[in-house]
Amino acid sequence: MTKNNEGFTHRNFAAVLQKYKYDLNLGDIVAGTIFSFELNGVLVDIGTPISAYLPIQEVSSNQDLNNFTSLNINDTREFFLLDYNIQSKQLILSIRRLEYIRAWKRIRQLLAEDSLLNVMIKGFNKGGMIINLEGISGFVPNSHLGNFQKSEQFNNKFIKLKLLNVEEKSNNLILSHRRALISQASSNLIVGNIIEGIINQITPYGLFIKVGNLKGLVHISEINIKNLEQISSQFKIGDTIKAVIIHVDKKQGRLSLSMKHLR
């Protein structure tokens, strides 16, 4: 019933509809009323002489939805005009495609507004966190989790995030917890302020400092040492240090610190 018809074009579709003197095109959004349930789909009245059919797999993009539980006889709503089945002579409708289009529209708006989002965690993998935003699967890389510890106990819990990269054509949705944390604490993150934090990572290029829920970097060039070998002997993980805020990168959620500028 839902199999695409090879070789069937928009011109063929237009010819079929012209026969019935009805002005529709593939990709149109149409209003319709559900009037019958079938084994693998529902029949919908969209005001055309040609019957319209909504396959079960086109009901929703939400994988948690169970078949037709969200639909009822006499429900009137909008559908996406997906295809025309030559064999059954039915217009094929989709709610899933309509949800997808509208979800990306909302995501583009959220990106433009740089909104702080409360998003459900769906799981974790080696590279980071998997989330769901407006029905679209998204990803938070490890580098943008900040001090958040990955654990399955957080599945289906909510986390504050900000959008980092949105590419609708490639269905690529990247978010950042680090950006959200910087945004929430921005009123206290003033360049020149002295902060106190705990060293939680020592690298050849500097010290990573835990400042509340935030992670800041004291680059090696901003530490009062004469050579690189001194960094491991002078500092230990767990040490509490003071540093000066020298840069707040809200776009990438980065906090740059300096020990050279301490008075």
From Swiss-Prot:
One of its GO terms (cellular component) is ribosome. The lineage of its organism: Eukaryota, Rhodophyta, Bangiophyceae, Bangiales, Bangiaceae. Keywords: Chloroplast, Plastid, Repeat, Ribonucleoprotein, Ribosomal protein. The keyword Repeat applies. Residues 27-96, 114-178, 192-260 form the S1 motif domain. Belongs to the bacterial ribosomal protein bS1 family. It is found in: Plastid, Chloroplast. InterPro entries: NA-bd_OB-fold (IPR012340), Ribos_protein_bS1-like (IPR050437), Ribosomal_protein_S1-like (IPR035104), S1_domain (IPR003029). This is Small ribosomal subunit protein bS1c. One of its GO terms (molecular function) is mRNA binding. It holds the Pfam family S1. SMART domains: S1. GO terms for biological process: translation. PROSITE patterns: S1.
